[in-house]
């Protein structure tokens, strides 16, 4: 039977900067559906909404010069799976996950989707264990370095946005994205997307664990080719 040692729970709570009054909430947040029907998906749903609200509130009050478009774009970069996975690794969440045998064999403790979902579940758990003010302060603490690095220039924009703006600037048609291939089993798929740009002879491919990530990767690759060809 899989168990989580008290020392691991204490280390995790130290990294979070929060000690649960009801530790069962933390244990539930760490429980994947493959381990038990008392899993973390409801907490994840709650945490997702709280994270979006908290980041929005922080941006609104911290950057009063920021317009709606910039806030939306930067919020997206702060709450995306990639950033949540970074947080999960900082917390060393993989050491504490409660996974079924199948997920353990497939190294589920390294799967980005599981790590990102667990961070959201922990946020939901802390909210239920305390209040909105406490979790918002914690989120601000976790994101402090990232918030300090916020730059409203192009490097904060996602690759698809940057590619679109590049093409518009050069008076070229917008790109077309289409699925090339889907590899792997349903629980661990890799999407391969084509990005078609009129000024490139061939479609440019991108890979990712979701269609959106694959499109972003393809856009990034297409933009690199265009910049290299045009010496921009």
Swiss-Prot record:
Cofactor list: Mg(2+)
User: Which residues participate directly in catalysis?
Assistant: 48, 120
Q: Cross-referenced Gene3D superfamilies, in alphabetical order? A: 3.30.160.20, Ribonuclease III domain (1.10.1520.10)
Localization per Swiss-Prot or TrEMBL: Cytoplasm
- Annotated signal sequence is none
What keywords would UniProt list here? Cytoplasm, Endonuclease, Hydrolase, Magnesium, Metal-binding, mRNA processing, Nuclease, RNA-binding, rRNA processing, rRNA-binding, tRNA processing
Domain RNase III per the UniProt entry, residue ranges: 9-131
Pfam families in alphabetical order: dsrm, Ribonucleas_3_3
The enzyme's E.C. designation = 3.1.26.3
Q: Name one GO cellular component term.
A: cytoplasm
Which Gene Ontology molecular-function terms are recorded? double-stranded RNA binding; metal ion binding; ribonuclease III activity; rRNA binding
Positions binding Mg(2+) in this chain are: 44, 117, 120
What task does this protein carry out? Digests double-stranded RNA. Involved in the processing of primary rRNA transcript to yield the immediate precursors to the large and small rRNAs (23S and 16S). Processes some mRNAs, and tRNAs when they are encoded in the rRNA operon. Processes pre-crRNA and tracrRNA of type II CRISPR loci if present in the organism.
As for family, the record states: Belongs to the ribonuclease III family.
User: How the protein assembles, per its UniProt entry?
Assistant: Homodimer.
Which NCBIfam families does the record associate with it? Answer: RNaseIII
Protein name listed in UniProt: Ribonuclease 3
User: Which taxonomic lineage is given here?
Assistant: Bacteria, Pseudomonadati, Pseudomonadota, Gammaproteobacteria, Enterobacterales
